[in-house]
Amino acid sequence: RKEELKVIVDHQKKHLFRFQNPVKKYSDFIGIENAILFCPDDLSLFTSSPKNRRRFIDMELMKLSKTYTSTLSSYQKLLKQRNQALKQSNIDECLVQIYLDQMIEVQSVIIKQRNEFLNSLMNKARELYPFFSNEKEEIGAKYMTFIPIDPDMKSHMKEAYDKVFEKEKRYHQTLIGIHRDDILFELN
């Protein structure tokens, strides 16, 4: 089936069209055409903050999966709600725990997807890198999260959150989680 997609970017915002009809939500574009564009500005990915690296991987995954988009959105809402609960003068620990239990569920999904995506991307990059470089360097990247990535991720998360809970109450915010993850790039 032939699709016609158009994106017009002006100095104020993006305008999205599908078959000449305006599209209100970016998520309506997801999964129609899979493409990753790389330009010189993207080199900042290696030198900028972890937030920008997370944003890069999230944007690419959102292009590939509406499920990822909704899961990430759920996490962001839960994180905001948990942080609001931690900011109360009289913290409702039961409510904070309810948010945490839900956060653990969605984080396990996001961690797996981010890690799988990065591994897949790096496999392709290792395959193509020799065509762009005369050097015999080996490149790599690792997804750095706050827990080991294994079948027991959820129990590791629970333990990690239990260890920092008193500190979170003092700082009135969630101190660990996927919102603090990073990508470690390696050369040789």
Task: State what each model feature region is.
Residues 26, 50, 54, 79, ...:
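Alpha-helix initiation and N-capping motif
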Residues 45, 52-53, 63-64, 75, ...:
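Residue-level detector of solvent-exposed, low-hydrophobicity positions
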Residues 44, 72-76, 176-181:
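Low-complexity, flexible helical/coil segments
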Residues 32-36, 48, 76-86, 184-186:
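Noncatalytic linker/hinge segments flanking ATPase motor cores
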